[in-house]
């Protein structure tokens, strides 16, 4: 996905070389089913297990599609509970957590977990946050930076840590960041 300059369904794979004979390189992969930008991935995956959620289809709307990658193709699975763009994610294909983002008209605080086939409501962020960085292995996750509702879009310099079903304040980033 992405914008190049139009919305595409391109996918690229990175093949990591482990010896001096074969160099690491990017290669074209199979196209995603719905071309879009601003989608979430869960940050942790493998060459045979990826997950993308939501996105924007061009001048069109924000969508709630979920697609899984099996190493050779993308398959649409259970839709995310709401339309979503620029959220944050953590986990793997069969145990993911997506939180925050925007539905295209307002920022979100919702958090949802994915079990490999369907989404379940999870713990919401204390403040709606989008275009931040999510990482971790669900159900433990961290949110660093991002933007909260307001105009112009501010960058935030805090981290939130999610464990045991609740979000707690983490350390501060030295510089505010978003995207």
Language-model features and meaning:
Residues 1-179:
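Polar, enzyme-active/binding microenvironments
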């Amino acid at each position: 996905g992405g914008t190049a300059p139009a919305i595409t369904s391109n996918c690229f794979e990175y093949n990591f070389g482990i010896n001096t004979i074969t160099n690491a390189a990017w290669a074209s992969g199979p196209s995603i089913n719905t071309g879009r930008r601003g989608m979430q991935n869960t940050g942790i995956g493998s060459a045979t297990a990826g997950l993308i959620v939501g996105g924007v289809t061009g001048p069109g709307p924000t969508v709630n599609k979920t697609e899984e990658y099996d190493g050779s193709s993308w398959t649409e699975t259970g839709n995310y509970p709401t339309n979503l763009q620029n959220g944050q994610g953590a986990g793997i294909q069969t145990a993911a957590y997506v939180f925050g983002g925007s539905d295209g008209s307002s920022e979100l605080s919702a958090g949802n977990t994915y079990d490999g086939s369907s989404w379940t409501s999870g713990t919401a962020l204390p403040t709606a946050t989008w275009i931040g960085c999510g990482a971790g292995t669900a159900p433990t996750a961290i949110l660093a930076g991002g933007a909260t509702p307001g105009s112009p879009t501010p960058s935030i310099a805090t981290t939130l840590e999610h464990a045991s079903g609740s979000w707690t304040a983490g350390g501060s980033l030295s510089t505010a960041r978003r995207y």
